[in-house]
Amino acid sequence: METWKAVLLLAAGLLCGAWRWRSREKRRYRRSVYRAETGKQYKKVEENRGMDGEYRTSLELEKRIRGRRYFVFNAYIPCRSGGSTETDIVMIHEKGIFVIENKNYCGQVRGRANREYWEHILPGKRRTFYNPIYQNQGHVRHLRRLLGEHGYHLPMVSVIVFNDGVKRLRVKMAGSDAILCRSRRAASKINRRLRRMEQVLDEAEMEEVYGILKAQTRPFWWVRYGQRKRAEKLQKKAGKI
Protein backbone atom coordinates (compact mmCIF):
# COMPACT_ATOMS: atom_id res chain seq x y z
CA MET A 1 0.00 0.00 0.00
CA GLU A 2 2.81 2.38 0.91
CA THR A 3 4.43 1.68 -2.45
CA TRP A 4 1.24 2.61 -4.31
CA LYS A 5 0.98 5.83 -2.32
CA ALA A 6 4.53 6.73 -3.26
CA VAL A 7 3.85 5.99 -6.95
CA LEU A 8 0.68 8.10 -6.90
CA LEU A 9 2.46 10.98 -5.18
CA LEU A 10 5.28 10.79 -7.73
CA ALA A 11 2.80 10.76 -10.63
CA ALA A 12 0.92 13.69 -9.14
CA GLY A 13 4.17 15.60 -8.72
CA LEU A 14 5.19 14.96 -12.33
CA LEU A 15 1.77 16.04 -13.63
CA CYS A 16 1.86 19.17 -11.51
CA GLY A 17 5.37 19.99 -12.76
CA ALA A 18 4.33 19.44 -16.37
CA TRP A 19 1.27 21.67 -15.93
CA ARG A 20 3.33 24.45 -14.36
CA TRP A 21 5.94 24.21 -17.14
CA ARG A 22 3.27 24.38 -19.83
CA SER A 23 1.54 27.31 -18.13
CA ARG A 24 4.85 29.17 -17.95
CA GLU A 25 5.53 28.47 -21.65
CA LYS A 26 2.07 29.72 -22.63
CA ARG A 27 2.54 32.93 -20.61
CA ARG A 28 5.91 33.50 -22.28
CA TYR A 29 4.35 32.94 -25.69
CA ARG A 30 1.52 35.40 -25.00
CA ARG A 31 4.09 38.11 -24.21
CA SER A 32 6.28 37.37 -27.25
CA VAL A 33 6.77 39.45 -30.37
CA TYR A 34 6.01 36.35 -32.44
CA ARG A 35 2.50 36.09 -31.02
CA ALA A 36 1.91 39.86 -31.32
CA GLU A 37 2.99 39.83 -34.97
CA THR A 38 1.39 36.59 -36.18
CA GLY A 39 -1.65 36.27 -33.90
CA LYS A 40 -1.23 32.48 -33.97
CA GLN A 41 -2.47 30.32 -31.10
CA TYR A 42 0.14 28.63 -28.94
CA LYS A 43 -1.25 25.14 -29.65
CA LYS A 44 -0.94 25.66 -33.41
CA VAL A 45 2.65 26.86 -33.08
CA GLU A 46 3.55 24.05 -30.68
CA GLU A 47 2.31 21.40 -33.11
CA ASN A 48 4.05 22.81 -36.20
CA ARG A 49 7.82 22.28 -36.37
CA GLY A 50 8.41 25.18 -38.72
CA MET A 51 6.41 27.69 -36.68
CA ASP A 52 7.87 26.44 -33.40
CA GLY A 53 11.40 26.84 -34.78
CA GLU A 54 10.73 30.40 -35.92
CA TYR A 55 9.22 31.21 -32.53
CA ARG A 56 12.19 29.79 -30.58
CA THR A 57 14.66 31.72 -32.71
CA SER A 58 12.68 34.95 -32.43
CA LEU A 59 12.68 34.61 -28.61
CA GLU A 60 16.48 34.64 -28.58
CA LEU A 61 16.64 37.65 -30.88
CA GLU A 62 13.91 39.53 -29.02
CA LYS A 63 15.75 39.17 -25.70
CA ARG A 64 19.34 39.79 -26.78
CA ILE A 65 19.66 41.89 -29.95
CA ARG A 66 20.99 45.37 -29.22
CA GLY A 67 19.50 48.49 -30.76
CA ARG A 68 16.10 49.35 -32.18
CA ARG A 69 14.47 46.67 -34.29
CA TYR A 70 11.20 45.37 -35.70
CA PHE A 71 10.33 41.80 -36.69
CA VAL A 72 8.22 40.62 -39.62
CA PHE A 73 7.33 36.91 -39.94
CA ASN A 74 6.34 34.95 -43.05
CA ALA A 75 6.31 37.77 -45.59
CA TYR A 76 5.59 36.78 -49.20
CA ILE A 77 8.00 38.87 -51.29
CA PRO A 78 7.01 39.34 -54.97
CA CYS A 79 9.40 37.89 -57.56
CA ARG A 80 10.12 39.42 -60.93
CA SER A 81 8.65 36.28 -62.54
CA GLY A 82 5.24 37.04 -61.05
CA GLY A 83 5.33 34.52 -58.19
CA SER A 84 6.53 35.12 -54.65
CA THR A 85 9.04 33.81 -52.14
CA GLU A 86 8.35 33.41 -48.42
CA THR A 87 10.79 34.68 -45.80
CA ASP A 88 10.79 33.15 -42.31
CA ILE A 89 11.95 36.14 -40.26
CA VAL A 90 13.00 39.62 -41.36
CA MET A 91 14.57 41.82 -38.68
CA ILE A 92 14.46 45.52 -39.53
CA HIS A 93 17.28 47.07 -37.54
CA GLU A 94 18.44 50.66 -37.42
CA LYS A 95 21.67 49.42 -39.02
CA GLY A 96 20.15 47.32 -41.82
CA ILE A 97 17.99 44.35 -42.74
CA PHE A 98 18.64 40.81 -41.48
CA VAL A 99 16.92 38.13 -43.55
CA ILE A 100 16.69 34.97 -41.46
CA GLU A 101 16.04 31.49 -42.85
CA ASN A 102 15.12 29.13 -40.00
CA LYS A 103 15.48 25.32 -40.12
CA ASN A 104 14.03 23.23 -37.29
CA TYR A 105 15.95 19.96 -37.82
CA CYS A 106 17.35 17.26 -35.56
CA GLY A 107 20.45 15.12 -35.94
CA GLN A 108 23.38 16.29 -38.07
CA VAL A 109 23.74 18.69 -40.99
CA ARG A 110 26.68 18.63 -43.39
CA GLY A 111 27.46 20.78 -46.39
CA ARG A 112 29.50 23.50 -48.06
CA ALA A 113 28.49 27.09 -48.70
CA ASN A 114 29.15 26.65 -52.44
CA ARG A 115 27.35 23.30 -52.90
CA GLU A 116 23.77 23.25 -54.16
CA TYR A 117 22.60 20.50 -51.79
CA TRP A 118 23.41 19.64 -48.18
CA GLU A 119 22.89 16.46 -46.14
CA HIS A 120 20.55 16.00 -43.19
CA ILE A 121 21.58 12.90 -41.23
CA LEU A 122 19.44 11.01 -38.72
CA PRO A 123 20.09 7.55 -37.24
CA GLY A 124 19.69 5.12 -40.14
CA LYS A 125 18.51 7.83 -42.52
CA ARG A 126 19.98 10.47 -44.81
CA ARG A 127 18.34 13.01 -47.07
CA THR A 128 19.50 15.93 -49.16
CA PHE A 129 17.98 19.39 -49.06
CA TYR A 130 18.53 22.60 -51.00
CA ASN A 131 21.37 24.77 -49.72
CA PRO A 132 19.63 27.32 -47.42
CA ILE A 133 22.33 29.90 -48.20
CA TYR A 134 21.30 29.77 -51.86
CA GLN A 135 17.65 29.77 -50.81
CA ASN A 136 18.13 32.88 -48.69
CA GLN A 137 20.11 34.64 -51.42
CA GLY A 138 16.90 34.57 -53.45
CA HIS A 139 14.97 36.07 -50.52
CA VAL A 140 17.54 38.83 -50.16
CA ARG A 141 17.53 39.59 -53.89
CA HIS A 142 13.74 39.93 -54.11
CA LEU A 143 13.55 41.87 -50.85
CA ARG A 144 16.23 44.27 -52.06
CA ARG A 145 14.25 44.89 -55.24
CA LEU A 146 10.98 45.43 -53.33
CA LEU A 147 12.50 47.97 -50.95
CA GLY A 148 14.39 49.61 -53.82
CA GLU A 149 11.05 50.32 -55.50
CA HIS A 150 10.16 52.35 -52.39
CA GLY A 151 13.47 54.23 -52.41
CA TYR A 152 15.28 52.16 -49.78
CA HIS A 153 18.73 50.79 -50.63
CA LEU A 154 19.85 49.18 -47.42
CA PRO A 155 22.61 46.81 -46.28
CA MET A 156 21.22 43.28 -45.98
CA VAL A 157 22.65 40.33 -44.09
CA SER A 158 21.68 36.73 -44.79
CA VAL A 159 21.33 34.61 -41.65
CA ILE A 160 20.79 30.84 -41.61
CA VAL A 161 19.64 29.50 -38.24
CA PHE A 162 19.26 25.84 -37.27
CA ASN A 163 17.35 25.21 -34.08
CA ASP A 164 19.13 23.47 -31.25
CA GLY A 165 17.82 20.01 -32.17
CA VAL A 166 20.75 19.88 -34.59
CA LYS A 167 23.53 18.33 -32.50
CA ARG A 168 26.27 18.66 -35.10
CA LEU A 169 26.46 21.41 -37.71
CA ARG A 170 29.36 20.71 -40.07
CA VAL A 171 29.24 23.30 -42.85
CA LYS A 172 32.27 24.87 -44.52
CA MET A 173 31.50 28.56 -45.05
CA ALA A 174 34.48 29.53 -47.24
CA GLY A 175 33.45 32.13 -49.79
CA SER A 176 30.21 33.19 -48.05
CA ASP A 177 29.52 36.23 -45.88
CA ALA A 178 26.24 34.77 -44.56
CA ILE A 179 25.84 34.06 -40.85
CA LEU A 180 25.29 30.37 -40.05
CA CYS A 181 24.59 29.18 -36.50
CA ARG A 182 22.29 27.40 -34.07
CA SER A 183 19.47 29.44 -32.57
CA ARG A 184 21.11 29.81 -29.17
CA ARG A 185 24.06 31.63 -30.80
CA ALA A 186 22.08 33.67 -33.33
CA ALA A 187 21.85 36.83 -31.22
CA SER A 188 25.56 36.90 -30.35
CA LYS A 189 26.55 36.32 -33.99
CA ILE A 190 24.22 39.07 -35.21
CA ASN A 191 25.37 41.49 -32.49
CA ARG A 192 28.96 40.87 -33.57
CA ARG A 193 28.04 41.81 -37.16
CA LEU A 194 26.11 44.86 -35.98
CA ARG A 195 29.20 46.25 -34.27
CA ARG A 196 30.78 46.63 -37.72
CA MET A 197 27.76 48.42 -39.22
CA GLU A 198 26.62 52.06 -39.19
CA GLN A 199 23.11 53.34 -38.49
CA VAL A 200 21.16 53.81 -41.74
CA LEU A 201 17.54 54.18 -40.55
CA ASP A 202 15.84 56.54 -38.11
CA GLU A 203 12.67 55.56 -36.25
CA ALA A 204 10.28 56.94 -38.89
CA GLU A 205 12.11 55.13 -41.68
CA MET A 206 12.11 51.88 -39.72
CA GLU A 207 8.35 52.15 -39.29
CA GLU A 208 7.90 52.78 -43.00
CA VAL A 209 9.99 49.75 -43.98
CA TYR A 210 8.08 47.70 -41.41
CA GLY A 211 4.80 48.79 -43.01
CA ILE A 212 6.01 47.81 -46.49
CA LEU A 213 6.97 44.30 -45.35
CA LYS A 214 4.01 43.81 -43.00
CA ALA A 215 1.71 44.36 -45.96
CA GLN A 216 3.29 41.27 -47.57
CA THR A 217 2.26 38.95 -44.71
CA ARG A 218 -1.41 38.79 -45.74
CA PRO A 219 -1.34 37.33 -49.26
CA PHE A 220 -4.25 35.84 -51.16
CA TRP A 221 -4.68 32.08 -50.75
CA TRP A 222 -3.37 31.34 -54.25
CA VAL A 223 -0.07 33.10 -53.40
CA ARG A 224 0.41 30.78 -50.41
CA TYR A 225 -0.62 27.78 -52.51
CA GLY A 226 1.89 28.62 -55.26
CA GLN A 227 4.69 29.08 -52.74
CA ARG A 228 3.91 25.71 -51.10
CA LYS A 229 3.93 23.93 -54.46
CA ARG A 230 7.30 25.47 -55.39
CA ALA A 231 8.76 24.35 -52.05
CA GLU A 232 7.43 20.82 -52.56
CA LYS A 233 8.91 20.69 -56.08
CA LEU A 234 12.30 21.82 -54.78
CA GLN A 235 12.26 19.21 -52.01
CA LYS A 236 11.27 16.47 -54.44
CA LYS A 237 14.21 17.42 -56.65
CA ALA A 238 16.56 17.35 -53.64
CA GLY A 239 15.32 13.87 -52.73
CA LYS A 240 16.53 12.53 -56.07
CA ILE A 241 20.12 13.66 -55.53
What is each stretch, according to the model?
Residues 86-92:
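Catalytic metal-binding acidic patch
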Residues 36-38, 115-122:
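Short, basic/glycine-rich phosphate-binding loops at helix/coil junctions
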